[in-house]
């Protein structure tokens, strides 16, 4: 198992239609907080420069989502719908992996946002808005069988991703990374979430099981991995 797609998929992939536009007369950008006034000014100057090419309406920019990083995402109305704007301070975030993997996914024929504009030195990006509704929002919890079609579509997308794999394109999902990921289970699930303490014999059993999992994964064909 090789090839880490995490830098891209931190942006939430969606199954929904584009959200409705902000009602006229509302200026939601006033509620967005900026730690640095100079970055706020640079952001609005850059966004205003996208009006001619992409029809954005800068006065409608509003918070969309955030992730476990310094990146922030905003939604902005346009003359044809909405777009997503990424704010990624270049001294804290490297957008190059995001851009590279976005191209990989689009080239594979997967449903992913296109990058419409990118100011690499400043860390601003304009993207397609593919919505905010996730698969978890639409699954039927009362009738699991009704979700079969959704899960098959998800599996088809993963197969398409794997079939597009090319060697030496993404960093390898090596033994060290696999071990680090597996270590999250005892540290975060058992200890933090379940409040369980395991003894030395249980830990030894876990370590042996993890080693078996790692070796079997390393022996399998190497393909792109969607870590989320």
Feature roles, as predicted:
Residues 8-11:
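Aromatic (phenylalanine/tyrosine) cluster motif
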């Amino acid at each position: 198992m090789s090839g880490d797609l995490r830098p891209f998929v931190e942006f939430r992939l969606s199954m929904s239609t584009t959200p409705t536009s902000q009602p006229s007369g509302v200026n939601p950008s006033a509620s967005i907080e900026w730690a640095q006034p100079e970055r706020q000014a640079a952001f609005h100057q850059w966004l205003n420069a996208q009006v001619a090419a992409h029809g954005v309406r800068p006065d409608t920019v509003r918070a969309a989502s955030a992730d476990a990083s310094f990146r922030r995402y905003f939604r902005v109305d346009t003359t044809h719908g909405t777009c997503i704007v990424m704010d990624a301070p270049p001294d804290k975030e490297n957008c190059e992996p995001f851009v590279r993997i976005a191209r990989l996914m689009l080239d594979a024929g997967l449903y992913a946002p296109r990058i419409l504009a990118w100011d690499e030195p400043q860390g601003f990006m304009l993207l397609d808005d593919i919505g905010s509704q996730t698969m978890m929002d639409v699954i039927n919890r009362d009738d699991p069988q009704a979700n079969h079609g959704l899960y098959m579509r998800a599996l088809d997308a993963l197969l398409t991703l794997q079939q597009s794999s090319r060697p030496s394109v993404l960093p390898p999902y090596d033994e060290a990374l696999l071990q680090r990921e597996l270590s999250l289970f005892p540290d975060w699930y058992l200890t933090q979430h379940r409040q369980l303490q395991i003894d030395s014999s249980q830990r030894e059993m876990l370590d042996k099981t993890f080693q078996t999992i790692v070796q079997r994964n390393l022996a399998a064909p190497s393909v792109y991995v969607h870590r989320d």
